[in-house]
């Protein structure tokens, strides 16, 4: 990470306070938080972890829509993935931050634990197709290779879970979070 600060005095004060001062976020009962994804996505989980579940959270389809919602006043805070410990920076997010009138006010870490989710009563040996975000498929590749199922990419892990739940086909599964399993009524 890099930060550009104009003068030495400002830089010294920033460094001195960086690890001791945490900015207090202004939260009201009607505070709205926008995140990229759908309920059960890891970005949704980050939003809930940072702001709590009592705040009004809503998802949008694309990263740039988070910045747009903030700039338009449709949301008070936004949550975007910045980096992934196994794959590095999330493509395009830094450009969105630079191109829009938004700033980072905090960070939260979410442990990514992938689960194989199927319709209630489905059996692992019957699974023929697994859906997930490309990164989820990559991170679970050794397991999926042993499973021998066809792998298909979708926009994110929670969308895969939602799709499997709606189709209710015991031969389909999703790689997604435990939270997505809870939200969409799937078995792990």
Model-predicted segments: where are they?
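Domain-level signature for soluble enzymes in the chorismate/prephenate branch of the shikimate pathway
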Residues: 2, 6-188
